[in-house]
């Protein structure tokens, strides 16, 4: 019996560790470093209906304990991804989670209705941190009613389970999570980046051309842990946790907080081998701490 295995809707994971969307492309670059079959899953780069060039540069900047990015969902568009990117991933047994983004509800529905055409795609990750252009640019994920409606629309057309990625830039994460669960979401992924800014002292302007960017890396881990714990306290919905994972102890901390699996983002840029390293280290650390299975961890904090 594989004590690292995790079963959640649409995903039979050999282990709970995977690269987060936006930090792994579509896997081709990383496949030169190690066998992608080692991974629990792969969260692929965001896909929109049409190609996107992304935001002007500079769009990445280092910060203390993390980084800022404002990539702007640069991607080659749905047709290219279906024809060229996902076929590459079909050679691996590792389940693919397709990240989907858009500017309107119709954008999401269009991509989600077709992305499951690839036999590699076992689930969808719905990126609801995108600005809703029909409602003044407010992110889909900051309003429970809007998030509910979008999730329901996508569920009506998707051929694979739908996981919704929660934004931390909200006053009440629980109301957002409950609205999404009520709409039929199969799971949650959390958290996305926190909105941040850096100033260049010489130019007196933001370092990021876009002005603000998403803060990721170790700086946001305590926020991610807190929000996962909050949601787990009120729901049994499957959760893939992310936000600042660097070490195997971070992985265990996310699992104890209530996550079923864990995604690694920014650290892939620092160490391309981070995911296989964590997979190797996890059972050893479990032995050291007297942990027999991952399942015993998920509600340990709640039961105290």
Curated annotation (Swiss-Prot):
Stored NCBIfam families: PRK07259.1, pyrD_sub1_fam
Active site per UniProt: 130 (nucleophile)
Highest rank taxon of the organism: Bacteria
Binding site residues for substrate: 45, 69-73, 127, 192-193
Binding locations of FMN: 21, 45-46, 99, 127, 165, 191, 217, 243-244, 265-266
Catalytically driven reaction(s): (S)-dihydroorotate + NAD(+) = orotate + NADH + H(+)
UniProt entry keywords in alphabetical sequence: Cytoplasm, Flavoprotein, FMN, NAD, Oxidoreductase, Pyrimidine biosynthesis
Pfam family, one: DHO_dh
GO cellular component, one term: cytoplasm
Protein name according to UniProt: Dihydroorotate dehydrogenase B (NAD(+)), catalytic subunit
Cofactor(s) listed in the protein's UniProt record: FMN
EC class of the enzyme, as a word: oxidoreductase
Compartment list: Cytoplasm
Manner of cofactor binding, per the entry note: Binds 1 FMN per subunit.
GO molecular function: dihydroorotate dehydrogenase (NAD+) activity
EC number(s) from the headed UniProt entry: 1.3.1.14
Oligomer status and interactors: Heterotetramer of 2 PyrK and 2 PyrD type B subunits.
One GO-annotated biological process of the protein: 'de novo' pyrimidine nucleobase biosynthetic process
The protein's annotated pathway: Pyrimidine metabolism; UMP biosynthesis via de novo pathway; orotate from (S)-dihydroorotate (NAD(+) route): step 1/1
Family named by the database record: Belongs to the dihydroorotate dehydrogenase family. Type 1 subfamily.
Gene assigned in the entry: pyrD
Keyword Transmembrane listed: no
PANTHER family in the cross-refs: DIHYDROOROTATE DEHYDROGENASE (FUMARATE), DIHYDROOROTATE DEHYDROGENASE (QUINONE), MITOCHONDRIAL-RELATED
Function: Catalyzes the conversion of dihydroorotate to orotate with NAD(+) as electron acceptor.
């Amino acid at each position: 019996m594989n004590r690292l295995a995790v079963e959640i809707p649409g995903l039979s994971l050999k282990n709970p560790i995977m690269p987060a969307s936006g930090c792994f492309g579509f896997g081709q670059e990383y496949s030169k470093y190690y066998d992608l079959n080692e991974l629990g899953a792969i969260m692929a780069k965001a896909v929109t209906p049409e190609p996107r060039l992304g935001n002007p540069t500079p769009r990445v900047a280092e910060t203390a304990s993390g980084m800022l990015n404002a990539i702007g969902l640069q991607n080659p568009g749905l047709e290219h991804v279906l024809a060229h990117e996902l076929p590459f991933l079909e050679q691996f047994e590792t389940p693919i989670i397709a990240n989907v983004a858009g500017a309107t509800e119709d954008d999401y529905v269009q991509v989600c209705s077709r992305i499951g055409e690839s036999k590699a795609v076992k689930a969808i990750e719905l990126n609801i941190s995108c600005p809703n252009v029909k409602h003044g640019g407010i992110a889909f994920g900051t309003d429970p009613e809007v998030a509910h409606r979008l999730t329901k629309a996508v569920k009506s057309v998707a051929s694979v389970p739908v996981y919704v990625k929660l934004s931390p830039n909200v006053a009440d994460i629980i109301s957002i999570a409950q609205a999404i669960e009520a709409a039929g979401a199969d799971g949650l992924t959390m958290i996305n980046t926190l909105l941040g800014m850096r100033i260049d002292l010489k130019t007196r302007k933001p370092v990021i051309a876009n002005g603000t960017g998403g803060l990721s890396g170790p700086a946001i881990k305590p926020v991610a842990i807190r929000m996962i714990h909050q949601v787990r306290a009120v729901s049994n919905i499957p959760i893939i946790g992310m936000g600042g994972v660097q070490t195997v102890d971070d992985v265990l901390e996310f699992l104890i907080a209530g996550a079923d699996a864990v995604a690694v983002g920014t650290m892939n840029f620092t160490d391309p081998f981070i995911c296989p390293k964590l997979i190797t280290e996890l059972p050893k650390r479990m032995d050291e701490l007297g942990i027999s299975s991952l399942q015993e961890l998920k509600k340990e904090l709640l039961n105290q």
